[in-house]
UniProtKB/Swiss-Prot annotation:
Highest taxon in the source lineage: Bacteria
Catalytic activity, as annotated: Hydrolyzes single-stranded DNA or mismatched double-stranded DNA and polynucleotides, releasing free uracil
Cellular component, GO, one term: cytoplasm
SMART domains documented for this protein: UDG, UreE_C
Protein name: Uracil-DNA glycosylase
Source species of the chain: Staphylococcus haemolyticus (strain JCSC1435)
Extent of the signal sequence: none
Length: 219
C-alpha cells in the first residue's frame, strides 16, 4: 500500500477541498511555513510500507528557515529548538548517540514518520492553522497506519499527542508515552524515559531492524 491510496479518498472530500482553497489564499497573502513543496515531506521521505515508528508533533515551527515538513526537525542551518535539544540530550543519555545537526531527514529515511498533527502555520503565529482541517487528515493517517501496518512504535510526547491513543490498536502496536521534551515539561518524566532504546528493543523483538538514531553524515 502507498500513501497515495490512503490520501485519495481524503483529498476528494469537500472538507479537504475547502482547506486546500483556504491554504491557497494563505500562501498568496501570508508567510506560511513550511514552503508549499515541503508540506508533505514526512510522507515523501518515509513510504507507507517503511513506517516502523511514528513520532507525533503538533504544528510546524513558525520562524524563518526552520520548518521543512518533519516534526521536531529544522533545516540544517537553523538554531536548535529547545525541544529538539532535549530530545538529543535524552538520546545521548539513553544510547550514547551525540548528534550535531538539527535536521532529522536520516531518521525519516530509517522509517521514522515525523508527523505533525497540523502541517502548516503562519509565520510567528503558533497554532494559527489549528482546526482548518489538518487534524482530520492526520487522524486518518494515524488510523491507516494502525489498521494496515503491524508492530509500529507510536511515540507520544505530551497530552495532545496522547489523546491520539484512541486512534491506535494497542493490541498490535507499541505505545511509548512521556511528558513532552519541551523545557516546560522535560524534567517531569521525559528525561530518563529511554524512548530510543525501548523502540529498538521492541522492533528487534518483532524481527525488524532497529533504527539508527545516531548521525549518519547524510545531512
Amino acid at each position: 500500500m502507498e500513501w497515495s491510496e490512503i490520501f485519495h479518498d481524503i483529498t476528494e472530500r469537500h472538507d479537504f477541498k475547502e482547506m486546500h482553497d483556504f491554504l491557497e489564499k494563505e500562501y498568496t497573502t501570508q508567510t506560511i511555513y513550511p514552503d508549499r513543496d515541503n508540506i508533505y515531506q514526512a510522507f515523501d521521505l518515509t513510504p507507507f510500507e517503511d513506517v516502523k515508528v511514528v513520532i507525533l508533533g503538533q504544528d510546524p515551527y513558525h520562524g524563518p528557515n526552520q520548518a521543512h515538513g518533519l516534526a521536531f526537525s529544522v533545516q540544517p542551518s537553523a538554531k536548535f529548538p529547545p525541544s529538539l535539544r532535549n530530545m538529543y540530550q535524552e538520546l545521548e543519555d539513553d544510547i550514547g548517540c551525540h548528534r550535531t545537526s538539527p535536521h532529522l531527514q536520516d531518521w525519516a529515511r530509517e522509517g521514522v514518520l515525523l508527523l505533525n498533527t497540523v502541517l502548516t502555520v503562519r509565520q510567528g503565529q503558533a497554532h494559527s492553522h489549528k482546526d482548518i482541517g489538518w487534524e482530520t487528515f492526520t487522524d486518518e493517517v494515524i488510523q491507516a497506519i494502525s489498521k494496515y501496518r503491524d508492530d509500529v512504535v507510536f511515540i507520544l510526547w505530551g497530552k495532545p499527542a496522547q489523546q491520539k491513543i484512541k486512534l491506535i490498536d494497542t493490541s498490535k502496536h507499541y505505545i511509548i508515552k512521556s511528558p513532552h521534551p519541551s523545557p516546560l515539561s522535560a524534567y517531569r518524566g521525559f528525561f530518563g524515559s529511554k524512548p530510543y532504546s525501548k523502540t529498538n528493543d521492541y522492533l528487534v523483538s518483532k524481527g525488524k531492524s532497529p533504527i539508527n538514531w545516531c548521525e549518519n553524515g547524510e545531512d
